[in-house]
Amino acid sequence: MQNSVNKFFIYLFFFILLINCSLSKKETSNQNEDIKIIFQKLKPIEKELNPNLNIQLQKLTKGKPFLRNNTNNSGNINFETNFDNLSSFKFKKIDQFEFNQPELLFTDSNSIIFFDGKGAIFNINEELNVNWKVNHYTKKERKLNPILYFAQNGKNLIVADNISKFYSLNLNNGDMIWSNSNQSPFNSNIKIYKNRFLAIDFDNVIRCFSLEDGSEIWNFKTEDSFIKSQKKLSLALKGEIVYFINNLGDVTSLNINDGSLIWQTPTQSNVIYQNAFSLENSDLVFANNSIYFSNNKNEIFSIDSKSGIVKWKQTVNSSLRPTIIENLIFSISEEGYVFVLDDKTGNILKITNALRNIKDKKNKIKPTGFVIAKNKIYLSLNNGRLIKIDVLTGLQENIYKIHGSKISRPYVLNGNMYLIKDNAIIKSN
């Protein structure tokens, strides 16, 4: 009898346990059904829109848009080429070229400044002949393969690098004027304003230095991330205001004179903050009293330059610098689609596939940069090709083979186009 009672309670215990498990699973299932996705990643647009819409551009950019351009907007350049005549200047290979965005510097005297894989700086003329070449790095520093950023200050050349050094050289011969070091490596272009220059380091600190001796005038620290993105950061100047973006996507406006905050606009959620190493923002561009930029998280922004208020946000998946011409914004996505947007509303007017005639599908082909000149888009690719596209129709006019791997965004000066590859500068006239 006792055994029967014990068996009864044992069976009852397991029966209750099974019911509870079933109810628990049902409750969990119901809870999952109630979960709402707050941050849902939008898929990049890979479909053409209004491909037959003609885009009319009336104005050409005056002056030299690649010379002392503090707004980063090149516009519609007065230039044209068919790449019939190519020449090159070779240098020691930059091993990390694939993952960095080094830039040419054009000087007031029309010379070209760049560097090689061991940190040697060279000054060449428009015909690609050497004016001078110097290397101010030690043997130990050269093994670090520094990436350099440049700006011109009259007769001097300002240099900052990704191994924490910054210095000033005589632009006539490359002689050292002064040298200094920073707490953290630099990771941005350099902008000059009156007697000072500005750059951003890997700690998301923008620093303002004296041109005379390199002493720090002020700095402004923004929120930092533990893991750093290799994507170059960007700053733009307009009047006495500097605008810059950090690797978390925060856009900040400061007074250049004293570094005081005017406004700061975060553009990413806390989810992105935790994965800042994967966020790649384009360069900032100032035009029409707005700041424009895009990123590889499928977003392009227009921010009011005075208030920091986001005017609009649209779906474009690009970390390439946009170009603003009149009331139109041109951007090219990582998937190779050309976007034309309305400046005021952010509405997408036209989308065309720039890679439709590219046959090489073995490796993922990505755009690396573009310029617009005389109503033509010149688009560089990471497989060494350059595509010429008609702005009016959106159709390809030609595909040129420049190199076997990544080439830079095109640069234009005095009727010549220049491209950078990992071991040479290519010239087309």
Model features per residue range: what roles?
Residues N125-N129, N170-G174, S210-G214, N255-G259, ...:
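Short loop/turn segments that connect beta-strands within beta-propeller blades
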Residues Q31-S88:
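Blade/loop signatures of beta-propeller domains
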